[in-house]
Amino acid sequence: MFCDDCHTLVLAGEIVDFSFRGISLMTDLMALVAGFILDLIFGDPHWLPHPICLIGNLVGFLDKKLRSLLGANKAALLFGGAVLVVSVIFVSFTVPYYILQLAGKINPMLAWTLETLMCYQIFATKCLKDESMQVYYSLLENDIPKARTKLSWIVGRDTQELSAEEIIKGAVETVAENTADGIIAPMFYMFIGGAPLAFLYKSINTMDSMVGYKNDTYLYFGRCAAKMDDLANLIPARITGIAMIFASAICGYNFANAWKIFWRDRYNHLSPNSAMSESVAAGALNIQLGGDHYYFGKLVHKKTIGDNIRSVEPEDIKRVNRILYATAVICLVAFILVYYFVCSVILRSDIA
């Protein structure tokens, strides 16, 4: 149980102190769980200001300013990209950190409430499901142009000429990939360092989505952001892949094939992390994902992921969303169990 000051955990009659920045690590965990539940219920209302948009605005501002100052010199662009990354992650971590520290000094419950709201806005579970289902409903209406438009909101590839099959694959791929980027990775960093560390992660992820491209504009300037994103997702992507395999079994999909394709195709992507979850989705649903796509008008060659056991269908979008939700719950429960295991180990060592 918890002590009244929200700074300690009572296990077996012993008090264990886990206080951090004026609030407790237990408070972080409680905020994580509460924020996750709020996200499942409310998602991201369009009228509510979103902190990730503020991070995006900061990235856009620094992007234009730095590139205008640096010109076309490769070394200067590499350095400028590093300056961008350091500046954005510094702001993204320190602002919520000191807000929570100040709130914790005023009242621990105020700090918990603020961190819960932060965690809620960081998660993207319901938003990802809702946006991908807009693609699904457009396909059911046989409105391919509308489906292309809806897909363009959640993918980076060119969607103007995509067929219905390619639209479905794009939606399945982005749900699978963003299961890691939008839910499990933020959850992982919240578990380690609360909302501030999760905001730091989201800032890296946002920079990668805005400047981490291998095109003429960002090949050098965006390299640091892209590499940082690869590093930040290294562990969460693999946690997501493993959890998705178990989620596929819970959802009644092809567990054995999910494991097989994960093990075989988990590196079949230009990113070292993206295929970790996409391979599981392909295997669980008995479909083939990946392949070549156009980005900013240029053809990008990609390996395929999975076997073409059957043709894709709109229902696959609903199926991958079920895997998304099951994966999120599995990871949430796993992190809670890890927390209590660590607490019990520390308690036993202190008693000894």
Predicted regions and their residues:
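Hydrophobic alpha-helical transmembrane segments
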Residues: 3, 12-200, 204, 212-352
